[in-house]
């Protein structure tokens, strides 16, 4: 038995020394299986493996039926975050002492099957009937099991649960908007003093001096301050969220709601499910919150029902359909994120995602139950609206605002806002995606044909539609011509004729294009202008005609108008891309292998300047809060990036004793990265990380600045570490970022290798993570085209890109890495930085100055570091 399997199962070579050979017991096993139903978690592996071994021993192939509990769990436990047997056991409260050991796995699989059957029997019969019809796509005999349970339920039907209703064949949770009723008449008094807060908190919350300062600062800003903007730096883990929610609860009403923006969907959920319920235990006027997300996060019931009428016949699609049928009996929000899926790019979600209320018709079966309409009603009865930064920033791009004006906007985790604002405002045009979309609309019985069929006697409208289709075809050809000209220009400048991954365009390069390419650009702009005129004319014509149309016809018209809006944006993008050469706009493209695969991008380095956004003037007061806002003595780095340099900054003293709670280590033998070969550097990382992982039996997060280096170190280490019982999870291997984080959080001693986004927003409880390794100081690669372009822009603004941008950004990332470790006054954490530039380079002193004061930075040999880390973390476990 290999070491890897020994660690996985706990079964050693010693234990099996006297065990019989499979050949000796094969006949017994075969006889035991006769007339049984084979149940397994991922039956395809177990059944086929066992069958192969039995046949090897000369026995006939198994013919017994089989049931797969993985597929059953995916269908009947749709909101579980993971379907691995160990994770399900933990989530459902099963005792699973020996994961991957046959007897323990079998017992837990049996418990899981019984629980799933119990859940199935609680479903409405109509739901199970629909699942049964789709279940032919499940493996082995799982479908027979579903039909068996259904038949038994039909023999003794139970009345429909009172919380459910049947609408047009779908069983749904009943929903009611909770009306906001003010418990108090007149003013409530905010508890400013320590004594008043202690009385209010009782035994539910502990009074904290720093949190009290934060609460009063928040209340004062929204009631007294003259300045519109205020920044507050408050350490993570000091009760920051409760610290701003409580004072706002004394001010916010549904007419003047508090809008709270945080960095991610996960943190939105955390505020909703953890922080507000805790605070509501203390308040005599409870907060009534609602999470607001873009429409596409919600399911459109009418569209989902449509997928059941004509199922596409693909297995994963059917599994999603069945899971959603179960989920609809549970959800009151229709928020697809409740399904914890990491692949929302599947065709199923494109088919069922909501597109907005403009696509609904009043006489549709599900109009009254529509989740987005329900959300809009809830917003009117809520005094706290919880959004994320991307949603907030997108307000600038919306025709109609989705957020109300208010006196109160609070932006949490504000240090993420500049990057998110720039990313959201990065305009792009994928020629391939657009052409496929137009081809689909041109297919028989698709949108254009359907619209045409609605106009049998409307000759003018038919003529406009015919011309419009011709113009779209000409536009697609013009796009290809322009793309070909740009690609020829770029390849002519490359020594090998190859295309780089990203190409930054300048006006000078555009002027070098040959005459025919210049003509193609003129044609492209002309087609866009003509399409604009046609769309305006068609809107006027259709507004008159559509009054006599049916609801389905109007929904198709809404789809056509959606295409119009898309082309309006496309025109603005390409017009800017070809004509607008202001310094802060970066024109670039991704070539692809052919002209049709080209993607145009327009990036705006001033997108994070808040005063120029649509939403900034709609709020009387804005408060910006985060754990790391100032960088050493530089108090205006972030406010400058946001265009609000005059905003005052208040710093709430950190409650943590970094001298006792944290250590930063820099190995004396760490190589100077630029002075050794790439292979020598990778070997050094492998040696350093192996020593640490072998010694410390706890979760470790390793942060890289290069995907290439990450992959090479992972490939060198992961098998040898697995044999020693340590699993390395790595970005780019084994699933999405969300899936990797989920597995890392659920495991007790995994190692996670991450780059890019793993530096940001890895939200783990302090006690779940005590060691972070930084393989190299987190500077952006200066050779990357976008970094070069940003540096050139900063220089044009009179800013030193290295000292005023790169160094502060690197310092901010290191502070955030340290902030992941220390979240309570009892946490201990270690930051191991395998880059000596922190202590040898001139700018290293600036970075150190930006880190918390008194955090010890130790330069030691690697072996001494291992020993010191072990002793430091062990002290914490011993309670000293």
Q: Where does each model-flagged region fall?
A:
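Signature of the SF2 helicase/ATPase Hel1-core->accessory helical subdomain module
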Residues: 269, 274, 357-384, 388-530, ...
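Conserved non-catalytic scaffold segment of RNase H-like nuclease domains
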Residues: 1-65, 78-100
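Acidic two-metal-ion nuclease catalytic site recognized across multiple nuclease folds
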Residues: 115-193
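Conserved RecA-like P-loop NTPase helicase motor core
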Residues: 667-679, 732-837
